[in-house]
Structure formats: structure tokens, C-alpha cells
Amino acid sequence: MEMVRPAARRSVGETQPPLPSIYSLTLDELKEWLVAQGEKPFRATQIYEWLYQNRVTDFADMTNLPKRLREQLASSFSITTLKTVVKQTSKDGTIKFLFELHDGYSIETVLMRHNYGNSVCVTTQVGCRIGCTFCASTLGGLKRHLEAGEIVAQVVQVQKALDDTNERVSSIVVMGIGEPFDNYDALIKFLRIVNHPKGLNIGARHITVSTSGIIPKIYQFADEGMQINFAISLHAPTNELRTKLMPINKAYPLPKLMEAVRYYIEKTGRRVTFEYGLFGGVNDQLEHAEQLAELIKGLKCHVNLIPVNYVPERNYVRTPRSQIFAFERALKKHGINVTIRREHGHDIDAACGQLRAKERKEETR
């Protein structure tokens, strides 16, 4: 494992809020702003190309724009840059970034390397309020939502790191710190920006959004008409067990969640992925596999079994590999499409929120 730790960090709240991030503007919003300034709408495409194809961080570098417009942009917007506080590189090529925001809060972003390309896992909130009992992200609670531009900036920052080796980000998973549907408007704007051909041009079917199950937003997301991949953090096959693992299940119980999933499938015609973390002696027995098969029977779906990373602050243990394979076989016996997630960054702080939690501990010593 390689670790890089740059200069000292700011204290939370130490700096003044910056100008609005231009990364938060969709192409249409940027066109509207330009027209209001007396500029031609085509300038928006030029600006997008500078931001997302050339990845400049200074409006002065946008040399095909009139000087007056560059000055207007600089006085109206910022180009969000994230300060790298910690960079951990795993033996398998996974890179975990701890980025510092303008107000001193920190977020995690992960670059995962696959045979088919490079995937970036982005964060949508500083902390999380959902309170899943197995997750490091909820330690310390929710501090604030990220703006769309702060989510976009994570992908841009990772892409800039890949530019040195002529690689590109080929897919995005919205599975980092926070509940994406708890920051819904910023999420949707982020998805439209990174998916736009003039933006980062990541294909919709190469983007996955995961939710713990905020039911009203599932219906709303289904109605958006986006071809984004959709995943549910399920982790339990019964209402009682899911409530123990995920307190959100009290507000949005499993039967109602499954109704929303059925609506999503019927509305979009797309498959849903159920993420199922395996916790030793808790939800990993063959009876749980049978219950899970019954729960999702007949649905257009896929199950992703997740060997969980150990989190010191939590009491859960990893399921033995032999038991994971037995669980997989039990599901396949029922005709369930199932895979075991490949583990990334096992030798670094790979669990979501783990690196940030460690840094928070060090700050308070």
C-alpha cells in the first residue's frame, strides 16, 4: 500500500464560501446565464469543452472566449478544486482519495480498476443520517449535503489524475458516503452533467445509483426517464432483520420498498440490482438465501453479494468464503442472477467512510 499525505488541512469552517461552482450548471443553465449577459448561447458549449474535455481550472485559460466574458465568468463562478489530503494506493491498483472541501470538511472518492475500464465511486454528502449499523459513513452523522458541482468535481479530479497515463473514467457508481436520494436534486443535476456528450460524456448505462430505500424518491427516479443503472442496498431478506441492520426500514418497510421496486421495473423496463452485504452469523445462512430468493422471485433483477470490509467501530465480522459460495449456490438454484462482488482495496481503508473516520479520529487527538 502506498500512501501520500500532503500539506496540513484547514479547520472546518475556516474559509469563506466560494463563488457558485460552474460545475453545478447544466449546459442549458449555462446558456441561460450567457444570454442574460448578452452573450451567444454557443459559448456554453465552448465553456463545457474547456471544463470537461480540457479540464482547465482557470477561466483565463479559456482562450477562445472574449476577455470580457472570461472576466465575467471569473467574477461570477468558481471552478471547484478539491484538495487531496490523503491518497492511498492498493496493491490491486485501487486508489482512495480523501478530498478536502472549501469549508474544511472531507469526503472520500475511490478509483477502481477493472478489466473493462476505470470506475469512480463518488460521495454525495458529508457524513450520512441513515444510520446503517454496519457502515462507517454514518459515524459522526450528517454534516451537510454536497452541491452538484462538488460531486462533479470528484470525477473531474480523478480524471485529471488519469490524464497522465492517457486513461479515462469509463463508469461511475454513486455509492460513496451519504444517501444519494437524500440529496436528490443535486444528484439528478450531477447525473445530467456527467452524462451529457459535451460534459464528461459517461454513458447512462455506465452509471449506477444506489439507495438505502427512500421510497418516494424511488418513484420519482423511475419517472425521470433516465437510463441509469439502479441498485437497492438490501442486506436482509426479512422486514425484521432489515430493521435491525438498517433503521431506515422503520420509516420505509421492506414490503413497501418492494412495491416501489416493482414500479421502477415496470416503468423503466430496466433491471434492478440488490446489494447484499454478508455479515457472519447475521444474514449469511442458507435460510436467509431461501428467504431472499422468495422475496425477489419473478423480478427482473440481479443480486450482488458483498464480502464486507471490517470496520473497527462496528461489531460485524466477515462471512467465510466457503459460506459466501454456498449462499451464491443457493440463490442460483432458484434461478436468481447472482454474482460475488470483486473486492477492491482490501489492504487500504476500503470500507465506505473508513478513511474519513480515521482522519476524524486523528484530528481530535
From Swiss-Prot:
GO terms for biological process: rRNA base methylation; tRNA methylation. Its cofactor is [4Fe-4S] cluster. GO terms for cellular component: cytoplasm. Keywords: 4Fe-4S, Cytoplasm, Disulfide bond, Iron, Iron-sulfur, Metal-binding, Methyltransferase, rRNA processing, S-adenosyl-L-methionine, Transferase, tRNA processing. Its EC number is 2.1.1.192. [4Fe-4S] cluster binds at C128, C132, C135. Its main location: cytoplasm. Residues 114-347 form the Radical SAM core domain. Gene3D superfamilies: 1.10.150.530, Aldolase class I (3.20.20.70). Disulfide bonds join C121-C352. CDD domains: Radical_SAM. InterPro entries: Aldolase_TIM, Methyltransferase_A, RlmN_N, RNA_MTrfase_RlmN, rRNA_lsu_MTrfase_RlmN/Cfr, rSAM. S-adenosyl-L-methionine binds at G178, E179, S210, S233, L234, H235, N309. Pfam families: Radical_SAM, RlmN_N. GO terms for molecular function: 4 iron, 4 sulfur cluster binding; metal ion binding; rRNA (adenine(2503)-C2-)-methyltransferase activity; rRNA binding; tRNA (adenine(37)-C2)-methyltransferase activity; tRNA binding. Binds 1 [4Fe-4S] cluster. The cluster is coordinated with 3 cysteines and an exchangeable S-adenosyl-L-methionine. The active site is at E108 (proton acceptor), C352 (s-methylcysteine intermediate). It catalyses: adenosine(2503) in 23S rRNA + 2 reduced [2Fe-2S]-[ferredoxin] + 2 S-adenosyl-L-methionine = 2-methyladenosine(2503) in 23S rRNA + 5'-deoxyadenosine + L-methionine + 2 oxidized [2Fe-2S]-[ferredoxin] + S-adenosyl-L-homocysteine; adenosine(37) in tRNA + 2 reduced [2Fe-2S]-[ferredoxin] + 2 S-adenosyl-L-methionine = 2-methyladenosine(37) in tRNA + 5'-deoxyadenosine + L-methionine + 2 oxidized [2Fe-2S]-[ferredoxin] + S-adenosyl-L-homocysteine. Specifically methylates position 2 of adenine 2503 in 23S rRNA and position 2 of adenine 37 in tRNAs. This is Probable dual-specificity RNA methyltransferase RlmN. It comes from Geobacillus kaustophilus (strain HTA426). The gene is rlmN.
